[in-house]
Amino acid sequence: YGECRNENVTLNNSFHGRTVTTLAATGQDVFHNYFFPFTEGFKYADADDMDALKAVVSDKTCAVMLELIQGEGGVNILDPEYVKELVKYCNDNDILVIVDEVQTGVGRTGKLLAHQNYGILPDLITVAKVLGCGLPIGVCMCGEKLKDVMSPSTHGTTFGANPVVCAGANYVLDTVANDEFLAEVEKKGQYFEDKLTKIDGIKSVRRMGL
């Protein structure tokens, strides 16, 4: 996306996967010790720090990718004001916003997708894991801005659109994508929070939904 843009920014303590490029995108040194060479072009900034983000953005920056809740990094929930400021900054500078919802998507946070809790609309969203309810599936969703960039057959996969897996995903969405189900997620999350905060030795509980 964009001419000569070959750099992307992710956040420290993020986790984006275990393939070579997603390991490069992951902002944790512990995951950078075993597989080489990594895909080049990734820079990292501290979460909830716009000055740190702006310091690593350049005219080569294509996208900023983030997890709204950093799971592997310690269940760090990004500050809503930071996220909104980040999205506005990226929109103003024609930088794509990618939200990795592999661990937070499909009802886990009390909304169908976690970014709905923040009132933002990313340019690209990745979803997997719970979407297949145990069956292997991954989805990359993009908006109008990328319709001419990610055209049919641009990306492919041996297992893509497996009919059994897609049928499973349809069932999951039919079950999860309704207000009553999602309200129960938040209700149960609040129940666990109330119980856990009463246990001696637990200093704090961080959650969004379940």
Description of each model-found segment:
Residues 1-210:
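Conserved N-terminal phosphate-binding loop of PLP-dependent enzymes in the Aspartate aminotransferase
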